[in-house]
Amino acid sequence: MLNFTGQTRRRNVNLGNRTRNSKKDLLEKAKRERERRAQDKLKEDASKTIQKSIRRHFSNVRLFKNTFTSSQLVHMIPAYGGKLIYYISQYDLQQLLKLSHNFLSSYPNSLGNRQLLSLLKLYQDDALVAETLSDLNMDCPTVDEFLDSLSVYLCRASFLSYSSASKLADVIEAWEVMHSSASISIFSISIGSYEKRPFALQFYCILAERNLLPQLINTNPILWDNMAKTYSHCSKGGQKNIAKLLIPNFNNHIAPSVLRSDNDYVLKFYEKAFIDEVIATTANYVSDEDHVKNLMCYIASSPNQSCKNSVLITLLSNKDFVRRLSWEFFHTKFNASKTEAHPLFSVLAQLIDMHLLISTDRELLDYNSVIPIEELKKFTSTLKDFTFRQYWELPKSERNPMLKEAVPLLSKVYERDSRLHFLSTENNPTYWENSEKQFLNLRFYEELQEYEDLYREHLEEESDEDMEKEIDLDKERPPLKSLLLNKMKKRLKSSLRFRKLEILLELPFFIPFEERVDLFYMFIALDKKRLSLDDDHNLINMFTPWASTGMRKQSAIISRDNVLEDAFNAFNSIGERFKASLDVTFINEFGEEAGIDGGGITKEFLTTVSDEGFKDPKHELFRTNDRYELYPSVVYDATKLKYIWFLGKVVGKCLYEHVLIDVSFADFFLKKLLNYSNGFLSSFSDLGSYDSVLYNNLIKLLNMTTDEIKSLDLTFEIDEPESSAKVVDLIPNGSKTYVTKDNVLLYVTKVTDYKLNKRCFKPVSAFHGGLSVIIAPHWMEMFNSIELQMLISGERDNIDLDDLKSNTEYGGYKEEDQTIVDFWEVLNEFKFEEKLNFLKFVTSVPQAPLQGFKALDPKFGIRNAGTEKYRLPTASTCVNLLKLPDYRNKTILREKLLYAINSGARFDLS
């Protein structure tokens, strides 16, 4: 068809899109319709049921209100009990309870009480609690139902007033509910955060104050936790009652888990009031092992060291109690063969440990001290024998667990005795040494060699070439001794030789000091053999240098004006190669000094470096205490730490080469060097050798009364003028935390920790790091601090002139010459200090070598210096040589020798 434009237009016709339903669609539609009708039917039936129930409910309500008389209503509670809550209002129930009071309170059997308690079980607040309880027939106890209902109520309720809680307590008291074993149920409800549910805590406090507490508490940790919370919030009377309940029950598996928690309320158990209750409860039963075991568990469960210290300090303040414990221990057969801890031993050991910590030397030696010195001696003897027998006679798997406390305590007593000699007296200098012949005569060199090999294997991955790696001071240290001993034990099966090695490493004082010194130098000899530094290799290297397998000599040119700096630059970076022979050339203002090193120049170098590094104030590397003993400066930077590290290596080299140096270190510093495995930690008793004034002031503080401490207005902060902070908090928020009698020991501990541990850690670690490059830690740890000082600088108290005479070499003299005879007579007549000055004059050190004068290298020599009587004796300390003119006159010899040693006249190396 043509339109008016003359074109054909296509026409679109919509015929619809409806399709014919299939059979499947029809069936699906019918199914949906049936399901819809079924749902509608269910809704209709449910609606009818609800309407029927509502009509029945209102009918019952009308029935209760309008049908029954008062005489009939009183039977409602016995008949329906808790069901009434669903049918009548709270107000109507309250009226019903009042109406039924006389009837129910005299109900002839337990039904009335049971039904009343079924109401209590369903309450969610305390609106009707008082009325419900007042209706109970108190002459007809229903304890089980009461406990069940009360437990449910405490879990459901949102509120419980003081008066309602008091009425509940009245029922508990009247019915003697706490005699029932089920009574723990009402204390075993997790009250959660007591800030959110204070009513439950208030209820427990009321019960505690009236001493309505459960009899059995060892079965439920929630109960223990609730008692702890309650104790922290109730009155003194309530606390006293809870203390009586808990104190006999610390010896169970539940108490430690509660006491060691992070909750603040647990700390109340470690305040003086509770500790006094513990003492009062235990004091009359120290002969009863269970009571003492309970005390032991209480101490062991302390949530932190501060709490434990508080317990021990409070116990020590009760002299009578400590004396009873001590008397009981010494009058009871101590069975060391038992496999479990001995309670009396454990408690007494911890008390003695604390006594050693806080007592001055004078207090420790006092016969009237809380632990008299005689008691300490007796206990130490028992402890010493027990510990040795356990180590020597038993493999590790069979040893008593008490060794965990015994070994560190015995070591502390030994350290204190090393200075005070209250055990190792003049009459018994070998007190600590074990005299058993089999033990003394047993040789264990193979075990020592194996331990050394294992130690070196362990160090293989740790190179000391990289100084920055060496000075990684915060690196965690593994317990090396235990690790290596356990490896050895698997192969050696705990032989006697292995046990002696254990004793050497963990209880070295059982081995005579002289033997330990020999073992120390044997360790060095083994190490020199490992590095091919021994004499045999030196001889081979001299004639066949092309075949050398050992370390080569380390050469350096050292200016007399910059000894320490030149030595540091030459030798600090070479690591273990510093153990090799040193080829040192000194230069002074005139040029190179002449001399061939036969050991003398090396000694001169080491002693000169030591003198400058330790004693020259311009370097500010070390400080002195009030006894002029040295320790590393606590003001340092990275460069100073490296120099301190190097000086540690120098001291190690001196020990390695048997070179004594005239340096006295502070005792606390030496103890730190021997405490590597425990992170160099020091305790309060070490503070005296760091700052005696501070130490004595803190001792006075510990002995002050509550009012005296309060008057000082002390807080947990410390002035630190050398720090950028100026004032340092000892604990978080320390500037606002005041020191009291209860926390004074914590304050003392924190001051000690800051002064000795935090401030000294890096410089001590640096010095020890350098020292241990040359001297392995376990070589040093065979000794105590006093013995280590003797290794470094010799034995001051004993100068054996006969030994010196027998180890003297003469040049230009014979032993029978008049001048030599006069010399030894004059030396014998010298005062002790003059003898020390003579030794310093000829050897540079005013002490004798530990192994006697035979250990001097080179040996002491006397050379004829001519016949001019006006000349003074001179010395070359580098070769231990005295140049003595042939005076042939005893008086002149005495005058000249005294003048020389007091003026320090010496020759240099020319």
Swiss-Prot record:
PROSITE patterns recorded: HECT
Pathway listed: Protein modification; protein ubiquitination
Primary location group: cytoplasm
SMART domains for the chain: HECTc
Chain spans, region Disordered: 1-25
Phenotype upon loss of function: Cells are viable.
PANTHER family in the cross-refs: UBIQUITIN-PROTEIN LIGASE E3C
Record-given protein name: E3 ubiquitin-protein ligase HUL5
Organism: Saccharomyces cerevisiae (strain ATCC 204508 / S288c)
